[in-house]
Amino acid sequence: MAEAAVASTVTLPVSGGWTKHVTCRYFMHGLCKEGDNCRYSHDLTNSKPAAMICKFFQKGNCVFGERCRFDHCKPTKNEEFSSPQMLPPSSPSPSTDPESSQPAPRPKTQDWANAAEFVPGQPYCGRAESVKVEISIPLIEELDCDAAVDKEALRKQLCPYAAVGECRYGINCAYLHGDVCDMCGLQVLHPTDNSQRSQHTKACIEAHEKDMEISFAIQRSKDMMCGVCMEVVFEKANPSERRFGILSNCNHCYCLKCIRKWRSAKQFESKIIKSCPECRITSNFVIPSEYWVEDKEDKQKLIQKYKDGMGRKPCRYFDEGRGICPFGANCFYKHAFPDGRLEEAQPQRRQTGSSSRNRLSEMLLMLLAAGD
């Protein structure tokens, strides 16, 4: 071992080391940042690798064109098959040799035990014997045919870059650049696929209508003022408070925070706190909304959407049948048992005389408030 170590140290050159005999792979790609200080060789005269040839150009679909940093040269067939060991052996006639029907043995993968010994600090020499690869001419022709088919398939697909903005490859792009949509202004319409064009146009119109609805809602809501705090809801300092509390039975404007605070007061009866602070009309619930809604049809859609959303959430008071919900059948939340069964609606009880008197007193209070 000592003699081998001495021999290895003697074979190394004094200046530069063994790395000067290895071509810098970053320099071969034009990306070496070390420059003249690089430990590896920057001499490409005797180290032009096959990897420098652009494999996409050989297939006929290199999108970089003249800007590609690899060589755009396709080797001739004489160069590809100049070595006799690369060609498949000619098969004898089946009539003369009875053993010709037997399948030819497949080349075995080289055993790892035959690999060259690895010495730390020394360049790796690879395996002791080179692996012979047999490639047939029909296989190369088949690959060329597949490349042509792939290129033709790419020309039928819309360019993903042009579909979202601008494609930097321009006319050299391997993909198809679609027609410009009048709605979104993007190149997303296939020139020949009418179904794709109609589907995109329909989706664009729906998105445009939705954007217009949001624009109208913002225009309708930006100047609305809360009737309790007297602040413009869209101009509140805290962004989380820029929400409206829509009453189900009247069109007076309140922010969600103020109307919830009003309805959570404990010193008044239930009917009083459920009534509007201005018109005294009772609303059984408040709908949170990002935009102000006043139209009757739009309010009904908002109420139905709110009820559907609440109906998918389990009621914490019902607690899967273990508790009692004080709201009963009027609860918007889901009353379901552990097995998935829904609670049956209980029949409503008839109002007693005391409840009727309470309603009359509340109506008198409303009339007095209206007279003031």
From Swiss-Prot:
Makorin-type Cys-His: region residues: 181-208
Gene: mkrn1
One Pfam family matching this protein: zf-CCCH_4
Annotated region (Disordered), positions in chain: 78-110
Record GO terms (molecular function): ubiquitin protein ligase activity; zinc ion binding
Enzyme class name: transferase
Record's keyword terms, sorted: Metal-binding, Repeat, Transferase, Ubl conjugation pathway, Zinc, Zinc-finger
Positions of RING-type zinc fingers: 226-280
Listed GO biological process terms: protein polyubiquitination
Name of this chain's protein: Probable E3 ubiquitin-protein ligase makorin-1
UniProt xrefs under Gene3D superfamilies: Zinc finger, CCCH-type, Zinc/RING finger domain, C3HC4 (zinc finger)
Pathway(s) it belongs to: Protein modification; protein ubiquitination
Function as written in the Swiss-Prot or TrEMBL entry: E3 ubiquitin ligase catalyzing the covalent attachment of ubiquitin moieties onto substrate proteins.
UniProt catalytic activity: S-ubiquitinyl-[E2 ubiquitin-conjugating enzyme]-L-cysteine + [acceptor protein]-L-lysine = [E2 ubiquitin-conjugating enzyme]-L-cysteine + N(6)-ubiquitinyl-[acceptor protein]-L-lysine
Compositional bias (Low complexity): 93-103
